[in-house]
C-alpha cells in the first residue's frame, strides 16, 4: 500500500477514469473524498468502499460546492494530501465548421466552465489544506492537451489551457505544493458531451474507440481505464515523486510517436462551406 494514511479528493470520481482512480487509491490505502453530480453513483461508491470513501454531491462549476467538498474532506479525514481535478466533458470532435453559430457561445462557456474553471475552483478551494499537508495536485489532461484532433477546437483549447495551468501553478505553489498532469488517451467510459450542443446524454462509450485506436496506437490497442491509474499513484506517492512538479506525462499508448496520417485536416472545407472556386 503506497498511500496508506493519505487523504485524496477527486472531482468527477463517480464514473469512468474517476471511478477507476477511486478504486485504485483505496486499494493503495488512501481515504478518498469524491465530488460528483450523481448522487446515485456516489452512493454506489460508498456502498462498495464503506468508510474509505466520502461522496459529496456538487457541481465543479460552483466554487461554493468545491469549498464544501474541501471542508468535508478535511472534517472527515483530517487533511488533503492529493487533489485530482478530473471532471470533464468532451465535444465529440465537433469541428469549428460544424459548430452552430447560435450555440457557439453557450458551448464555449460550458466546456471551459467545466474543463478549466472547474479545475481552478478545485485548487482554490483546497489550497490551504494542500499547503498545510505539503501535498500535490494531479490534473487529468488528455492527449488533446498535446496534439490536434483529439477533440474539436473547444475541447482541445480547454485541454491546452490545463497544460498551461500545470506549469503556472507548479511555479506559483512551489515549494509547498507539487503540481503535475497526466495526459491519458481514449477511454471507454460514460464521458458526456456539452448539453448546449445536444450531447448531454451522449456517452463516449457509444463511439467505437477501441477499433479506431487499435490501428492508431503503437501499443496496438486501447488501454483499459484501470491501466491509466498507475501514473496518478506515482505522482501522489511522496517517496517516489518528490522531485516531480510541473511534469506533463504523455500516457496515451504512444500516440505522439505514431507519425502523421494526413498533413491537412481541412481537405473537405470547400465542400462543407459550399465554396466553389
UniProtKB/Swiss-Prot annotation:
Substrate binds at residue 142. Belongs to the short-chain dehydrogenases/reductases (SDR) family. Keywords: Aromatic hydrocarbons catabolism, NAD, Oxidoreductase. GO terms for molecular function: cis-2,3-dihydrobiphenyl-2,3-diol dehydrogenase activity; oxidoreductase activity, acting on NAD(P)H, oxygen as acceptor. It comes from the Bacteria. NAD(+) binds at residues 9-36, 59, 159. InterPro entries: BphB-like_SDR, BphB_TodD, NAD(P)-bd_dom_sf, Sc_DH/Rdtase_CS, SDR_fam. NCBIfam families: BphB_TodD (TIGR03325), PRK06200.1 (NF004849). It is an enzyme of class 1 (oxidoreductase). PANTHER family: BENZIL REDUCTASE, CHAIN DEHYDROGENASE, PUTATIVE (AFU_ORTHOLOGUE AFUA_4G08710)-RELATED. The lineage of its organism: Bacteria, Pseudomonadati, Pseudomonadota, Betaproteobacteria, Burkholderiales. CDD domains: BphB-like_SDR_c. GO terms for biological process: catabolic process. Pfam families: adh_short. This is Cis-2,3-dihydrobiphenyl-2,3-diol dehydrogenase. Its EC number is 1.3.1.56. The active site is at 155 (proton acceptor). It catalyses: (2R,3S)-3-phenylcyclohexa-3,5-diene-1,2-diol + NAD(+) = biphenyl-2,3-diol + NADH + H(+). Pathway: Xenobiotic degradation; biphenyl degradation; 2-hydroxy-2,4-pentadienoate and benzoate from biphenyl: step 2/4.
